[in-house]
């Protein structure tokens, strides 16, 4: 069945592709729109007119629009874009040819001072296209340049990019999957940055809901990039050392990365009050964590000609964990009150290797056909020992398991590019995962097998009418789960749609909807115990089925000078929700998972951002409701903000996040102070040398209390993160670019 399904999808995609290509048998005219510096003008409106009739109209993508004219003749070609002076020429067209239109930026004269017009962000069906300022392009740091975008929260020192709500977007370069390549980009090469807050069914399949697409200028001979970074806590706790490089010519490039991180002397204290029936265990203690992590990759890129691109990536990851804990307390029953001691130890490791191949072909009409294949091998093993001593009674418990994963993925996608009729994309993908789990505590050793299939085919269409933009994407998803106890197959729809209205005076109103499906994780399906608590077991459920997720978003944006204000609301609905529940067997609490009806989550909030040349700040407030099946709605507040002040070669940066509570189906967490309170001072010593010192948590000692309450059992666990609080770190990085304008863009997905 799976082979026939893939064949049908491949034939359908190929048929659509041949149909699109055959339509354009008339004369094609490639229109390049550039500014005075010969950089492409993104999203310029282009029209081709014959006499009094407009024969073609469209918007540039990467500075190019391909027009179709019915026959030879003299045509009037016009281009306009916000912030530029419109341009118009006449051209005699007799065969397929190229036209270059050069637009000049508008200037406003005020008392003999010339002020270049600020480029207004361009609204699309799914998001917004930003053009970076000249200051951002000349800053030399791509993360600092991206921080100019109002809806992004960028940590320049740690090289991370988040949305204002804390979600990490998928990073694309020139529309291609790309996750590890922001650092090598010279910001002077950035033509535009598109932030998509609604994605097509293709990206929903990957679990992505936000995209940051960085479009670059095209050039290329020899170039190189290298970077060394190191960061360490004081006193010693967490540290890292990393190096990356890229070197290449016009048609070939190689890049690589090696990173080492460590964690030492990390102490977290616990105050635990646990009751099971009439028995009570109260204890205080401390967990000491030790980890070592190694990861790296090697990436090869080859462009034999301007229309074909090949890349291959090889990655490796290993993570080792060594934890120890000791608790002292009292064990209380109706007749006894004895001292209680608890010792715990954990030795774990996980990691894997990945190899992937990517190919892309560009057609003459700027449409693209891309294919991708991946193999991933993963492993995880853990041995945990818990010993409880109560008077003369000693109770040891152990968890000892080993997991192996083989995962295969293939995909093919077609993108028509921007055309007069809009943009059409279609494609198909298949991911097959095989997991083996060994439970060494069981006698004989228990071996469990889990297989998951996730196949998908889709088509998307996007266009606009005046200031109204729309996108619709639909597909069908085949989900299969096979365990030792059960096997199920599910056909599910997958849908994404958006409607965006660009109102006068820099106002935008956007409504969006998506429906997607999610397979249960293997850890939720494997039916053996993974807890060392003798009163409380945790095990999976092999009979789970996929969750169906629906989301409705409504956003209103208003820009006023350097300010941007947003008011928003979001509603989520999870059908066949996989949630935790607890049952009692032989006076033991067993936490497992089940598909339990419907979960509903709703939030409303507002966000304000200010972006000036040397000062940037944002603040948001949000109220959330969570409603689990059979329970009443529970609400909580979420606040976050950030500020950055640049002065000379220095900048001061701070972030702040606070919430009062959070909920699951069986427990809730109370937060006693902010979840994040970070401040740092950075210094760009030279163009190559950068240093920063930070206090990752300055609000005292971060703490929270986790509470679980049910009939016959309760646990209250107060946690204090002692080592990660009030502990500064120092980061130093050295970066060297040579001919950075000539870098080949990475288009291989980073998994």
What are these regions (language model features)?
Residues 507, 517-566, 573, 591-602, ...:
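Outer-membrane beta-barrel signature, preferentially recognizing the C-terminal barrel domain
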Residues 148, 176-202, 243-245:
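Short acidic/polar hinge/loop motifs at secondary-structure boundaries
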């Amino acid at each position: 069945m799976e082979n026939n399904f893939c064949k049908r999808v491949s034939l359908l995609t190929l048929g659509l592709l041949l149909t699109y290509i055959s339509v354009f048998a008339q004369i094609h005219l490639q229109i390049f729109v550039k500014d005075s510096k010969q950089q492409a003008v993104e999203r310029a409106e282009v029209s081709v007119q014959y006499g009094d009739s407009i024969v073609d109209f469209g918007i540039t993508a990467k500075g190019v629009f391909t027009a179709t004219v019915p026959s030879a003749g003299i045509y009037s070609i016009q281009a306009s874009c916000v912030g530029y002076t419109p341009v118009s020429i006449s051209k005699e067209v007799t065969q397929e040819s190229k036209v270059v239109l050069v637009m000049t930026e508008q200037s406003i004269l005020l008392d003999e001072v010339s002020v270049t017009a600020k480029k207004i962000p361009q609204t699309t069906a799914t998001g917004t296209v930003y053009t970076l300022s000249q200051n951002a392009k000349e800053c030399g740091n791509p993360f600092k340049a991206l921080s100019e975008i109002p809806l992004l929260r960028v940590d320049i020192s740690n090289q991370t990019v988040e949305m204002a709500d804390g979600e990490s977007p998928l990073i694309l370069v020139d529309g291609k999957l790309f996750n590890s390549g922001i650092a090598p980009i010279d910001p002077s090469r950035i033509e535009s940055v598109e932030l998509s807050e609604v994605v097509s069914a293709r990206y929903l399949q990957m679990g992505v809901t936000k995209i940051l697409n960085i479009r670059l200028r095209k050039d290329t001979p020899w170039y190189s990039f290298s970077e060394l970074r190191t960061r360490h806590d004081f006193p010693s706790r967490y540290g890292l050392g990393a190096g990356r490089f890229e070197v290449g010519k016009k048609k070939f490039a190689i890049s690589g990365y090696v990173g080492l991180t460590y964690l030492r002397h990390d102490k977290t204290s616990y105050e635990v009050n646990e009751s099971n029936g009439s028995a009570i265990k109260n204890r205080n203690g401390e967990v000491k964590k030790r980890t070592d992590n190694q990861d790296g990759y090697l990436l090869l890129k080859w462009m034999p000609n301007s229309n074909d691109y090949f890349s291959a990536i090889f990655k490796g990851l290993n993570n080792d964990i060594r934890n120890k804990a000791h608790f002292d307390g009292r064990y209380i029953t109706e007749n006894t009150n004895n001292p209680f001691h608890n010792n715990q130890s954990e030795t774990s490791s996980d990691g894997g290797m990945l190899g992937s191949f990517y190919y892309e072909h560009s057609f003459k009409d700027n449409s693209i056909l891309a294919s991708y294949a991946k193999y991933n091998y993963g492993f995880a093993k853990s041995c945990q020992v818990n010993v409880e001593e109560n008077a003369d009674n000693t109770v040891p418990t152990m968890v000892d398991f080993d997991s192996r994963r083989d995962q295969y993925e293939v995909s093919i996608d077609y993108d028509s590019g921007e055309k007069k009729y809009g943009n059409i994309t279609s494609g198909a993908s298949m991911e097959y995962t095989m997991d083996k789990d060994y439970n060494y505590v069981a006698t004989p050793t228990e071996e469990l097998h889990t297989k998951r299939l996730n196949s998908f085919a889709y088509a998307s269409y996007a266009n606009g009418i005046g200031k109204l933009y729309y996108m619709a994407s639909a597909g069908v998803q085949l989900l299969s789960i096979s365990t030792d106890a059960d096997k199920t197959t599910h056909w599910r729809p997958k849908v994404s749609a958006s409607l965006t209205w660009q109102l006068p005076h820099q106002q935008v109103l956007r409504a969006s909807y998506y429906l997607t499906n999610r397979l249960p994780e293997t850890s939720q399906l494997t039916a053996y115990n993974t807890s060392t608590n003798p009163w409380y077991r945790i095990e999976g459920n092999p009979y789970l089925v996929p969750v169906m997720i629906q989301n409705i978003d409504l956003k209103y944006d208003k820009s006023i000078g350097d300010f941007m204000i947003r008011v928003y609301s979001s509603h989520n609905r999870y059908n066949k929700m996989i949630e935790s529940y607890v049952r009692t067997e032989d006076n033991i609490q067993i936490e497992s998972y089940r598909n339990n009806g419907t979960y509903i989550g709703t939030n409303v909030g507002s966000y304000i951002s200010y972006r000036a040349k040397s000062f940037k700040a944002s603040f948001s407030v949000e109220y959330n409701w969570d409603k689990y099946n059979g329970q009443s709605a529970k609400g909580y507040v979420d606040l976050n903000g950030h500020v950055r002040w640049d002065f000379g070669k220095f900048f001061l940066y701070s972030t702040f996040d606070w919430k009062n509570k959070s909920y699951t189906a069986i427990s809730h967490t109370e937060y006693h102070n902010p979840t994040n309170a970070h401040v740092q001072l950075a210094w760009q010593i030279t163009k190559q040398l950068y240093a920063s010192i930070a206090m990752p948590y300055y609000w005292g000692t971060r703490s929270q209390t986790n509470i679980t309450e049910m009939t016959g059992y309760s646990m209250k666990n107060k946690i204090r993160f002692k080592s990660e609080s009030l502990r500064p770190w120092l980061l130093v990085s050295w970066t060297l670019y040579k001919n950075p304008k000539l870098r080949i863009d990475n288009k291989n997905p980073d998994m």
